Regions:
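Hydrophobic helical h-region of N-terminal Sec-dependent signal peptides
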Residues: 6-13
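Acidic/His-rich structured neighborhood in mature extracellular/periplasmic domains
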Residues: 85-186
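Short, well-ordered helical secondary-structure segments
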Residues: 6, 29, 138-140
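Positively charged n-region of N-terminal signal peptides that target proteins for export
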Residues: 1-4
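C-terminal motif of bacterial Sec signal peptides marking the signal peptidase cleavage site
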Residues: 15-18
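Acidic/polar, low-complexity intrinsically disordered N-terminal segments immediately downstream
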Residues: 20-104
Length: 186
């Protein structure tokens, strides 16, 4: 009986003290650095894309931007886009990968940011060591991945223009996989 009375007193106390009269106000939106990131032609396209879909396209990003996640560690690494390939990379992404989705889909299911990287990869442990005792890892390239609030396109480099048709199809498939993976995780 004592436990029951103690439990009732605790629940009653919680109920009384949880009824605050403070007005609820929304928090300020999070900012993730400067946007747009420059004044090139593609920067204006990124602003238009943001105004239309609510998605920032970033080509300068930090490790924290790439890894920002609440529940898990992202086992990938990303390198920023090569500056001379940003326009070609964005054109490829926009014309071959994003154009297949409806505007409604892009507004509802795209992440907060698209990160343009020259390379995205994971590291696989080879269980070997070099002469100095350091672990040796094998680099496993990826072309696109998604995180909690971003999609990273990892082919914005000088090699993009020289890809064969089959390599471009594979690249489009990886991006589509990342977009659908992000959309289904929402």
């Amino acid at each position: 009986m004592k436990k029951f009375i103690y439990l009732m007193i605790c629940l009653l106390s919680i109920g009384i003290y949880s009824c605050g009269e403070d007005d609820l106000t929304p928090s300020e939106p999070m900012t993730f650095g400067e946007f747009p990131q420059g004044d090139a032609t593609y920067d204006q396209e990124f602003v238009e894309f943001y105004n239309k879909y609510g998605v920032q396209v970033l080509y300068k990003f930090s490790e924290a931007d790439f890894r920002w996640n609440i529940t898990e560690y992202i086992p990938y690494y990303a390198i920023e886009a090569e500056s001379n390939s940003i326009e070609d990379g964005w054109s490829f992404l926009k014309e071959n990968c994003l154009s297949i989705w409806s505007d409604d889909f892009l507004r509802k299911f795209m992440p907060y940011r698209i990160l343009l990287g020259s390379e995205v990869y994971s590291l696989k442990d080879t269980y070997q060591y070099d002469d100095e005792g350091n672990k040796i890892y094998q680099k496993i390239p990826k072309k696109a991945i998604y995180g909690l609030n971003h999609l990273t396109f990892g082919a914005v480099n000088g090699r993009l223009s020289s890809l064969s048709v089959s390599e471009k199809k594979e690249l489009i498939g990886e991006i589509a996989f990342a977009i659908t993976g992000y959309a289904t995780s929402k």
